[in-house]
Design a protein with these regions (language model features):
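Hydrophobic alpha-helical transmembrane segments of polytopic membrane proteins
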Residues: 153-167
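Hydrophobic alpha-helical transmembrane segments and adjacent short intramembrane/lumenal linkers
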Residues: 139, 143-153
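Residue-level signal for the membrane-embedded core of alpha-helical transmembrane segments
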Residues: 10-13, 17-20, 116-119, 123-126, ...
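Transmembrane alpha-helix/interfacial motif
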Residues: 2-47, 55
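Residue-level signature of catalytic and energy-coupling elements of molecular machines
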Residues: 4, 22, 55, 64, ...
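Predominantly long cytosolic amphipathic alpha-helical stalk/bundle segments
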Residues: 33-142, 169-210
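Transmembrane alpha-helical segments in integral membrane proteins
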Residues: 21-28, 163-174
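Alpha-helical transmembrane segments of multi-pass inner-membrane proteins
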Residues: 12-13, 147, 155, 159
């Protein structure tokens, strides 16, 4: 509490950044867990040729809705391969739109992970400068003169590391998880696109049932 105002400002900024990072991390972990269940159900249903519900309330449902929308817009002159490519393209566009929303917050984690140590270093340098100033003012190199500036300098460094380390680890994990989720959805999209392109009657009955 008795630290220099500059060092104290650095500590406050790093503490707020750490709090924001943990908020993003917890929110992403919970959301990714929910989407992972949707991915598994979507991929399993697409593999087995089961009827999928086009619900706008979840990611898998929006992908299915995009696929059904492209399937309805059929052109008698197009081949099955062309129809499949068009249906898959519509579903991939829906997927990419949601993927961009899921990436929200990840750049902030990357920024904090790379910048927090340097922000903490600013506080460290300022605290050491205060220690040298105290030595010059008192003409004394005892521990009681040097310790306050060194202590606040080291504490600023520690807060920078506390903010940066979880941010870097979480960014790497969440980015990897997001890539895996996207690949799983793409696999389901390919299977669903194939079913929609070649098995018209099955999905026509499914649409009628809805």
């Amino acid at each position: 509490m008795q630290a220099d105002p500059i060092v104290k400002s650095v500590m406050i900024v790093l503490a707020l950044a750490s709090l924001a990072c943990w908020t993003i991390i917890i929110e992403k972990l919970l959301r990714f867990r929910m989407i992972r269940r949707q991915t598994h159900a979507f991929e399993t249903a697409a593999r087995n040729g089961e009827r999928l519900t086009a619900e706008a309330s979840n990611l898998a449902g929006r992908i299915v809705a995009a696929g059904y929308g492209a399937w309805r817009d059929q052109d008698p002159s197009e081949s099955r391969m062309e129809r499949r490519e068009r249906i898959e393209r519509a579903m991939r566009l829906a997927l990419s739109y949601d993927m961009r929303h899921l990436q929200t917050g990840l750049p902030f984690l990357a920024t904090v992970g790379s910048a927090a140590p340097f922000i903490g270093l600013l506080g460290t340098v300022w605290g050491i400068m205060n220690s040298f100033s105290a030595i010059a003012a008192s003409q004394d190199t005892s521990l009681s003169v040097v310790a306050p500036g060194i202590a606040e300098a080291l504490f600023a460094t520690a807060i920078g590391l506390v903010a940066a380390i979880p941010a870097v680890i979480a960014y790497n994990k969440l980015t990897t998880d997001l890539g895996r989720l996207q690949q799983s959805f793409i696999g389901g999209i390919m299977m669903l696109g194939d079913h929609l392109a070649r098995d018209r009657n099955h999905y026509l009955r499914a649409e009628a049932a809805e």
